[in-house]
Amino acid sequence: MAKTMMQDRLINPLEGAADAPDANIRPALLAEYIGQPVVREQMEVFIQAARARDEALDHTLIFGPPGLGKTTLANIIAREMGGNLRSTSGPVLERAGDLAAMLTNLEAGDVLFIDEIHRLSPVIEEILYPAMEDFQLDIMIGEGPAARSIKLELPPFTLVAATTRAGLLTSPLRDRFGIVQRLEFYNIADLTTIVSRAARLMRVPMSEDGAVEIARRARGTPRIANRLLRRVRDYAQVRGDGSINGAIAGSALDMLAVDRRGLDHLDRRYIEILHERFDGGPAGVEAVAAAMAEDRGTLEDVIEPYLIQQGYVLRTARGRVLTQMAIDQMV
């Protein structure tokens, strides 16, 4: 039940079926990529250098909170390198044969994108090591005493991996990535540009203050910004003339219970529980999760990152602690 509530949450940064239209408005090239200036500049250099040498780009690990554009960046890398993108995820690769099938279907210059790579099984990791280092695939033929190992040569390819939990990657896997990029929460100016661009592509008339209002409440996350834009568009059609300004955007988001800080009922409930049941902390994440009837992963991946980044909560060795700012503003 808690999982369903989280999935229905408007400002849930995890991707859902409702986000499918976003594929039509995602940037396709680095020149169109908004925000993350350090990552963008570095990737421009790395990609241009690899193309000039006619080599595959080094294997790339992208990590950071959900909804910041890891999949979008993987698509851009494939397009910029002129290869095809083959996508999968850690939980999907259950058997060695699953990964072997994907690797043997790659062509030179292709990009293999593995989302949630921290969820790979050890067996799959072992197959990846020689594939990443030497472009070789070791497979077993036969069973029992007659079984033998053979090596298959793979074309040069780039593994692009994404994770929200870089700390869960094993050292041998992490060390095999030549490029490691961390995506940060977006500032309001960059999110405003993203919202304005999306509205233009969706052919929704919108003023600058309308874009700013949506960006302010989007929790530093483009996926949430695009989702809020679609709901504000609905409100503008029904309660207005179809165009979005600051007042319309504010009224729509107030109706949707997303406040000016980008917080909703689950954020406020988290803070209330930490304040009332645990006297502001420190409190262990398992205890807070149990009190909210959520799982630990949901708190760590979905609720806490933005609260911590905004300075409402501290993550200490002894547990979670409310800051004075959270108490002053929300309790």
UniProtKB/Swiss-Prot annotation:
<keyword id="KW-0238">DNA-binding</keyword>
<keyword id="KW-0227">DNA damage</keyword>
<dbReference type="GO" id="GO:0005737">
    <property type="term" value="C:cytoplasm"/>
</dbReference>
<keyword id="KW-0547">Nucleotide-binding</keyword>
<keyword id="KW-0963">Cytoplasm</keyword>
<dbReference type="InterPro" id="IPR004605">
    <property type="entry name" value="DNA_helicase_Holl-junc_RuvB"/>
</dbReference>
<comment type="similarity">
    <text>Belongs to the RuvB family.</text>
</comment>
<protein>
    <recommendedName>
        <fullName>Holliday junction branch migration complex subunit RuvB</fullName>
        <ecNumber>3.6.4.-</ecNumber>
    </recommendedName>
</protein>
<comment type="subunit">
    <text>Homohexamer. Forms an RuvA(8)-RuvB(12)-Holliday junction (HJ) complex. HJ DNA is sandwiched between 2 RuvA tetramers; dsDNA enters through RuvA and exits via RuvB. An RuvB hexamer assembles on each DNA strand where it exits the tetramer. Each RuvB hexamer is contacted by two RuvA subunits (via domain III) on 2 adjacent RuvB subunits; this complex drives branch migration. In the full resolvosome a probable DNA-RuvA(4)-RuvB(12)-RuvC(2) complex forms which resolves the HJ.</text>
</comment>
<dbReference type="GO" id="GO:0006281">
    <property type="term" value="P:DNA repair"/>
</dbReference>
<dbReference type="GO" id="GO:0016887">
    <property type="term" value="F:ATP hydrolysis activity"/>
</dbReference>
<dbReference type="InterPro" id="IPR041445">
    <property type="entry name" value="AAA_lid_4"/>
</dbReference>
<dbReference type="GO" id="GO:0006310">
    <property type="term" value="P:DNA recombination"/>
</dbReference>
<keyword id="KW-0378">Hydrolase</keyword>
<feature type="binding site">
    <location>
        <position position="315"/>
    </location>
    <ligand>
        <name>DNA</name>
    </ligand>
</feature>
<dbReference type="InterPro" id="IPR027417">
    <property type="entry name" value="P-loop_NTPase"/>
</dbReference>
<dbReference type="GO" id="GO:0048476">
    <property type="term" value="C:Holliday junction resolvase complex"/>
</dbReference>
<dbReference type="GO" id="GO:0005524">
    <property type="term" value="F:ATP binding"/>
</dbReference>
<feature type="binding site">
    <location>
        <position position="320"/>
    </location>
    <ligand>
        <name>DNA</name>
    </ligand>
</feature>
<dbReference type="Pfam" id="PF05496">
    <property type="entry name" value="RuvB_N"/>
</dbReference>
<comment type="function">
    <text>The RuvA-RuvB-RuvC complex processes Holliday junction (HJ) DNA during genetic recombination and DNA repair, while the RuvA-RuvB complex plays an important role in the rescue of blocked DNA replication forks via replication fork reversal (RFR). RuvA specifically binds to HJ cruciform DNA, conferring on it an open structure. The RuvB hexamer acts as an ATP-dependent pump, pulling dsDNA into and through the RuvAB complex. RuvB forms 2 homohexamers on either side of HJ DNA bound by 1 or 2 RuvA tetramers; 4 subunits per hexamer contact DNA at a time.</text>
</comment>
<dbReference type="InterPro" id="IPR036388">
    <property type="entry name" value="WH-like_DNA-bd_sf"/>
</dbReference>
<dbReference type="InterPro" id="IPR003593">
    <property type="entry name" value="AAA+_ATPase"/>
</dbReference>
<keyword id="KW-0233">DNA recombination</keyword>
<dbReference type="InterPro" id="IPR036390">
    <property type="entry name" value="WH_DNA-bd_sf"/>
</dbReference>
<keyword id="KW-0234">DNA repair</keyword>
<feature type="region of interest" description="Small ATPAse domain (RuvB-S)">
    <location>
        <begin position="187"/>
        <end position="257"/>
    </location>
</feature>
<dbReference type="GO" id="GO:0009378">
    <property type="term" value="F:four-way junction helicase activity"/>
</dbReference>
<feature type="binding site">
    <location>
        <position position="71"/>
    </location>
    <ligand>
        <name>ATP</name>
    </ligand>
</feature>
<feature type="region of interest" description="Large ATPase domain (RuvB-L)">
    <location>
        <begin position="1"/>
        <end position="186"/>
    </location>
</feature>
<dbReference type="GO" id="GO:0000400">
    <property type="term" value="F:four-way junction DNA binding"/>
</dbReference>
<dbReference type="Pfam" id="PF05491">
    <property type="entry name" value="RuvB_C"/>
</dbReference>
<feature type="binding site">
    <location>
        <position position="176"/>
    </location>
    <ligand>
        <name>ATP</name>
    </ligand>
</feature>
<feature type="binding site">
    <location>
        <position position="25"/>
    </location>
    <ligand>
        <name>ATP</name>
    </ligand>
</feature>
<dbReference type="InterPro" id="IPR008824">
    <property type="entry name" value="RuvB-like_N"/>
</dbReference>
<dbReference type="InterPro" id="IPR008823">
    <property type="entry name" value="RuvB_C"/>
</dbReference>
<feature type="binding site">
    <location>
        <begin position="133"/>
        <end position="135"/>
    </location>
    <ligand>
        <name>ATP</name>
    </ligand>
</feature>
<feature type="binding site">
    <location>
        <position position="186"/>
    </location>
    <ligand>
        <name>ATP</name>
    </ligand>
</feature>
<feature type="binding site">
    <location>
        <position position="26"/>
    </location>
    <ligand>
        <name>ATP</name>
    </ligand>
</feature>
<feature type="binding site">
    <location>
        <position position="71"/>
    </location>
    <ligand>
        <name>Mg(2+)</name>
    </ligand>
</feature>
<feature type="binding site">
    <location>
        <position position="70"/>
    </location>
    <ligand>
        <name>ATP</name>
    </ligand>
</feature>
<feature type="region of interest" description="Head domain (RuvB-H)">
    <location>
        <begin position="260"/>
        <end position="331"/>
    </location>
</feature>
